[in-house]
Each structure stands twice: as structure tokens, then as C-alpha cells.
Design a protein with these regions (language model features):
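Donor-binding/catalytic cores of nucleotide-activated saccharide
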Residues: 68-72, 89-194, 205-219
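Acidic donor-binding segment of Leloir-type glycosyltransferases
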Residues: 21-61
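Short aromatic/hydrophobic "clamp" motif used to bind/position activated sugar donors
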Residues: 84
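C-terminal subregions of glycosyltransferases and related glycan-biosynthesis enzymes
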Residues: 26, 202-294
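Glycine-rich, basic loop-to-helix element that forms the pyrophosphate-binding segment
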Residues: 62-79
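Short, well-formed alpha-helical segments that are part of the catalytic scaffolds
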Residues: 9-26
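Cell-envelope/extracellular polymer assembly enzymes that use nucleotide-activated donors
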Residues: 3-5, 23, 31, 182
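Conserved short acidic donor-positioning loop in nucleotide-sugar-dependent glycosyltransferases
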Residues: 12, 24, 37-39, 66, ...
Length: 294
């Protein structure tokens, strides 16, 4: 019986994908789904593609090149487990993943939030940017579970009941950036019971050339558009205090072009609720002051 399905979108980093696969135990109750997003044959040897020689790995090759959101949605079609996890191809799981599988096989929870730590891929240095056990426990202890539900966007920072996402038809946005935000907010909204594990399960690697750190115009506009959608939803369910920080992406457009920035700023003012604007401005200046002091 398959208890856990893990979806890994991949594009052009086969060595890192192999490392990710090696970190996942070869258990009969674990299904691994790798969805290749039209990788370049000059970079990837498809005859020796990672996972092809492993019994619990299913490799799906797509030619559409529509990004991680499309790849994850494609992977969901093949899920057989009762729990769903995600990993990025350049990340990997800690040795505690076996413990996670043993501890939560029969859990009645809808979502298990997974602590992680962040490592610089080049230097191997531990970074402070991570979802710590202490922070998670504090949020639940102080009954701030909404912080997890509406601010924990990363799909790999949670383990989700498959029956729940199927019941509510929750899927990823098929956009070039921020495909996971809408998915995660909806998962947080519909989940009745949530919990956390009290140990590090996931190792996130920072690559500064990756999508997350790109100031590409298309990526920024995608993040802004998703932010508007999420903030409208949060406003409708009276959770606007967990707003998506769209202003940062609008301000980042200054580095691309002033005309584009002013155009998007006008749209931002028109589309964004006034209380979100005020909160965002306060947050922006608070961060500026903090950086000056530092």
C-alpha cells in the first residue's frame, strides 16, 4: 500500500535531482513522481535519467515547458498515496524523513507542517532563512495557526492529505512564478486539523541564479498578479492581516524600468485594499530602517 507520494518537478539539473532521490528512502509505501519540464537534451542524458532504474520512482516527461506549477499538477494526476509531499529538485530530505513517515502514517490531521533549514548551495553554510521547529511550535501554542495556514507558501514545507486536495480540487497556478502561493493558501483555508513535526525534515538549498532570486520582468509581474488574487481571497475570508507582500515586487520593477514601475504602481493602488497598502508601506519602511541600523 502506498502511503506517501512525493512530487519533484525537474528542469536541467540532473545531478541535483539524483541527490534529492538518494535522500528519499526506498520504501514500499513511498511513491516518487518526477516530472521533467522539457529539459534540454544537451544538458540531460535522457537514457540515464535519474530514477529510471528505481522501482518506486515514476518519471513523467513533459514537452510543454510550462513551469513548476504545471509539472506539479501533472504529477498530482499520478498520485497513489494518502499523503502528498513535494520537493524541489535542487533540495533534499534529511535522515528524519523515515521518522516522519513512521510517525504520521495513520494521523488524522489534514496538514503536517514540516520544519526545514536553508543551506547555501555553493558554500554549504547554514542560513537563518528557514521554518524552524521553535517558530512553528510558538505559532500553534499561541493559537497563531493562521500564520502557518496563510503565510507558509512553500509546498515542500507541508505534508498534505490527498483526499483533502481532491475533495476541494486544489491545484497549483500554472504561471511562471509564485505558482505555489494560491495552492498553499487554499490548503491552509480548507484544512480542519493541522499539526507540526518537531524535527527538521527538509533541506532547502539556495541557488542565487534560481527563479526565486530573479528580477526578470515576467517573473515579477506573475508574482504581482498572484498576490492580487491571494489578497482578494484573504480579504473575502476576513484574513487580510496575512496579506501577500505584493508591494515589494512592484518596487523591484524600478530596476527594470521607471515607466513599467509607475504603470504597475497605479495598478497596485487601484487593486490593493487601503489597509493592505498602509500595512505594506509600514513594513517597507520598517525593513529599510532595520537594514540601515544593521
Amino acid at each position: 500500500m502506498i502511503n506517501y507520494s512525493i512530487i519533484i518537478p525537474h528542469k536541467n539539473i540532473p545531478n541535483l535531482l539524483q541527490r534529492c532521490l538518494d535522500s528519499i528512502p526506498n520504501r514500499e509505501d513511498v511513491q516518487i513522481i518526477v516530472v521533467d519540464d522539457n529539459s534540454d537534451p544537451n544538458i540531460v542524458d535522457f537514457d540515464k535519467f535519474p530514477g529510471l532504474n528505481r522501482s518506486n520512482v515514476e518519471v513523467i516527461f513533459t514537452k510543454e515547458g510550462k513551469g513548476a506549477g504545471y509539472a506539479r499538477n501533472t504529477g498530482i494526476k499520478y498520485v497513489k498515496g494518502k499523503w502528498l509531499l513535494f520537493s524541489d529538485a535542487d533540495d533534499y530530505f534529511s535522515e528524519n524523513v523515515n521518522r516522519l513517515f513512521d510517525d504520521y502514517e495513520n494521523s488524522v490531521m489534514d496538514v503536517i507542517y514540516i520544519p526545514y533549514k536553508t543551506i547555501d548551495l555553493i558554500t554549504g553554510e547554514d542560513l537563518e532563512d528557514g521554518l524552524c521547529v521553535t517558530n512553528l511550535e510558538e505559532d500553534l501554542y499561541k493559537k497563531r495557526s493562521d500564520t502557518l495556514r496563510y503565510r507558509c507558501y512553500s509546498p515542500w514545507a507541508k505534508m498534505v492529505k490527498v483526499s483533502m486536495i481532491e475533495r476541494y480540487s486544489i491545484r497549483f497556478e500554472e504561471v511562471v512564478a509564485s505558482n505555489d502561493v494560491w495552492f498553499s493558501v487554499n490548503v491552509g483555508y480548507v484544512a480542519k486539523e493541522i499539526d507540526i513535526c518537531n524535527y527538521i525534515v527538509y533541506i532547502r538549498n539556495v541557488r542565487y541564479g534560481s527563479l526565486q532570486y530573479s528580477l526578470n520582468k515576467e517573473y515579477l509581474l506573475s508574482r504581482i498578479k498572484v498576490g492580487y488574487k491571494v489578497n482578494d481571497f484573504l480579504y473575502d475570508i476576513n484574513k487580510i492581516e496575512y496579506y501577500n507582500y505584493t508591494l515589494w515586487f512592484v518596487l523591484a520593477l524600478i530596476k527594470i524600468g521607471l515607466l513599467l514601475f509607475f504603470k504597475q504602481m497605479i495598478i497596485y493602488i487601484y487593486k490593493t485594499h487601503i489597509n493592505v497598502q498602509l500595512r505594506s508601506i509600514y513594513r517597507f519602511f520598517k525593513e529599510v530602517v532595520y537594514r540601515i541600523i544593521q
